[in-house]
Amino acid sequence: MKIIHTADWHLGRILNGKSLLEDQAYILDKFIEAMKLEQPDVIVIAGDLYDTSYPNKDAIQLLEQTIDILNLEMSIPLIMINGNHDSKERLNYGSKWFEKSHMYIRTDLNDMNKPVTIGNVDFYTMPFATINEMQYFFDDKAIETHQQALNRVLAYMHEVIDENKVNIFVGHLTVQGGIRSESERPLTIGTVESVDENLFNQFDRVMLGHLHHPFSIESNFINYSGSLLQYSFSETKQPKGYKIVEIKNQKITDKFIPLKPLRQLEVIEGNYEDAIQEKLEVKHKENYLHFKLKHMSHVSDPMMHLKQIYPNTLALTNQTFDFNTSIHHENIEIQKLDDETIIDNFYNSITGEHLTTNQSKKIEKIMTALLEEGSK
């Protein structure tokens, strides 16, 4: 059996004011093309299909078009759960009717002990739920962490698990030690959200969503597929794609398949003038860029100038104040320096230049006014 594991599509995502829908449509086209070659027996989407509980109509239409092609045109069974970004109600609409075409949308906690069976494989689904929802479902106020909730869920599943089959757990959660990214919204506020990987030992395989790095943890049987695209500048070095899990002769193997996006995210560091003169190394001008530049304090609206050359510049950081670098302490007694010299040294440390005669005169005028005000 060939299983495709994907998650964290985040359709409708907006990054620093820029809609990524065009990029998402492009990567889903690539995903569909790949599925035509892969011919999988089932596709598992482990949550966060949308980026928000209230996706716009274009995001909804993109998901519907993708699902129609994969499920109705290509007749591939789909198993989907909601993530912490999704609305259960919106995602679950018509789910019972969709099962007739082997599209299983699992957002109801009541279905956690009702596996989706495909061949000799049982898929146990755990949709994302808050601690309060878990307390209500199990009628137990003692559940205060995701680990405690997962313990109850796994015991609930264990009541019906068939050890003669291959049992796969599908969830949207954080395993301890997993690599985090800036674009991942915390599962909960005020409680520990990570869980111990040893809890899953009753399963042959665990397919997860939420963490965007496809190699978030080192495990022989727990997999994160990662997101289809880079969704924050902390993900620029992360590969993006999907995973293939194959079950053959009672052996389970997996491999990661990268997908090439329309645009990548890049972080570019250097001096402002080098950026404007196109001397800094940029893979492609159309990529989404975050510039971290020095020596631009004297520039009026540097973002505007950068966008004239790099139209998809999404972020700009002034690195002049870099407190992480070591500070060079000159052997000077600051008490012996006059005010103008101190200010000139400070200005030079920031801009790499010294005060002009006109700037010095203005500062002298301000200092005189301050001294006169202080003596009153």
Curated annotation (Swiss-Prot):
Gene Ontology MF: a single term: 3'-5' exonuclease activity
Keywords: DNA recombination, DNA replication, Endonuclease, Exonuclease, Hydrolase, Nuclease
InterPro entries assigned to the protein according to its UniProt record, in alphabetical order: Calcineurin-like_PHP_ApaH, DNA_Repair-Maintenance_Comp, Metallo-depent_PP-like, Mre11_N, SbcCD_nuclease, SbcD, SbcD_C
Coiled coil: none
Record NCBIfam families: sbcd, sbcd_Staph
Function (record text): SbcCD cleaves DNA hairpin structures. These structures can inhibit DNA replication and are intermediates in certain DNA recombination reactions. The complex acts as a 3'->5' double strand exonuclease that can open hairpins. It also has a 5' single-strand endonuclease activity.
Protein name in the entry: Nuclease SbcCD subunit D
Species of origin: Staphylococcus saprophyticus subsp. saprophyticus (strain ATCC 15305 / DSM 20229 / NCIMB 8711 / NCTC 7292 / S-41)
